[in-house]
Amino acid sequence: MELEPGSGEERNRWQQTSLLSLVAPAQLCDGTAEKAVEATDGAATPSTPSHQPPPPARLLILDTETTGLDPLKHRCIEVGAVLFDVPQRAVLSQISFLLPCQTNEAETVNGIAAAVTRLSQPWPEALAYFQTLVAASDLILAHNAGFDRQWFGHGPLPAIEKPWLCSMEDLRWPPDRNLRANPSVRDLALAYGVPVWAAHRALTDCIYLAQVLERCDDLEGLLCAGLEPRQLYRARLPYEERHRARQAGFRWNDPVPKAWSRRLSAREAAAIGFPVSLEQLSA
């Protein structure tokens, strides 16, 4: 589930899951992980990347709907997925299914009544087919992947061992689309001329994202850039220039207290246009 940034306290809470646990898969698009080196002026200097292997050929675009924020207290009640072929820009298969729950505290957000999830339906068979789609993919792509990923390995959902990529935080959409940093699925779809007819159901958001990818001229380059290893950086700007950090997609107080921070590759950090430094979060 991805909710629009900046549209209320509850929506902001849904996006505050840290993506630091997402490890970019070096074997797909990066032969040797880049290492960020902090220069004396606070800027980062990237090492020279080695030869890059081909980008992933098969993506599983994935989204979830849940009863709350915490996988230890709440449940995933809907999974949507689209198997997407990158070279052909084509949807190969798609699935959506509900998982039964007793109550849904987020019904006002996703519109899924708990009673509907308990209606007779072949969700175990659907879950089994979903696992075949996972097996057929090279990479899992999700909008706000840090949120979606945490539900797998809880309840009936198996853990997913494939690499993950976040279309909200890790992909740098072309400047000519006039998107803000970390765009919502809705804004992303509209920027690519995809009609938006519904929101907050799992398969709907997957379809939006698949149609965006169909329209990407350099999807392979976009994916490879997104898979570059990333680390957490803090913006080193005076208070009166804080707008520069915000415009560059840095977040205030999340996850670094009282600081503007964002996950960047070493190449991005060197080109950001203002001083940044590597940040280590305490356990």
Question: Each predicted region: which residue ranges?
Answer:
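Conserved beta-strand -> loop -> alpha-helix junction used to position metal-binding or nucleic-acid-contacting
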Residues: 160-173
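Conserved non-catalytic scaffold segment of RNase H-like nuclease domains
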Residues: 11-162, 178, 182-200, 248
